[in-house]
Amino acid sequence: MSLLQFQQVGYWYKNKSQPLFQDINISFQKGKFYTIVGTSGTGKTTFLSLAGGLDAPKEGNILYDGKAVSKIGLTNFRNQYVSIVFQAYNLLPYMTALQNVTTAMEITGSKEKNKESYALDMLQKVGINEKQARQKVLTLSGGQQQRVSITRAFCCDTDLIVADEPTGNLDEDTSKEIVRLFQDLAHKEDKCVIMVTHDEQIAKVSDINIRLSRGSFTVKENVAVV
């Protein structure tokens, strides 16, 4: 069964006669790494906002594990069922980087016994050392904050992870490591990962690439993922 399903989803900003999306039907499964690409104005971030419960469709339904997200409630859905990595970071500025991660783990019911140790290990994997992990996030650079946001998503006990350009502020080596971690989440942890990216190289190593154009989309399954 699909983890997330769009059923005849339509969305528009001001006028129904000029929809951004119309009659979108697509399913997302656990164990898969999806990328979404498209030119500016095709609705990539809006699509991801719908998938992550940050916005609701104007028409149609979005189902999570067979249940309508509208019935679950957007706030409850975001808090309990999805981990979100957006460019705005959405971190708690007066908490430390470590506290941001462990608090999210508590909220989503992580079963890790030593949450602090696990979070520190994951932060180090994305280039945040222990000293930085114990600093308030408002003292960290934009790129460092992005790494904390990514780590928070990695550590939360949710089956769905949505990410908007998560490697945008990172150097090439760190970007490759982040993509590898997203792949591992999908393939080794059986998560559903949906990532918006402008990087065609990342799109090539995803399992399924969704290319948006105005009002429509195409889906390509990548046979060999390196």
From Swiss-Prot:
Q: What residue stretches are annotated with the ABC transporter domain?
A: 4-226
Q: Which PROSITE patterns match?
A: ABC_TRANSPORTER_2
Kindly name one Pfam family recorded for this protein: ABC_tran
Q: Which GO terms describe its cellular component?
A: plasma membrane
Q: Which GO terms describe its biological process?
A: transmembrane transport
Q: Where does ATP bind?
A: 38-45
* Keywords of this entry: ATP-binding, Nucleotide-binding, Transport
- Write out the GO MF terms: ATP binding; ATP hydrolysis activity; transmembrane transporter activity
The name this protein carries in UniProt is: Uncharacterized ABC transporter ATP-binding protein YclH
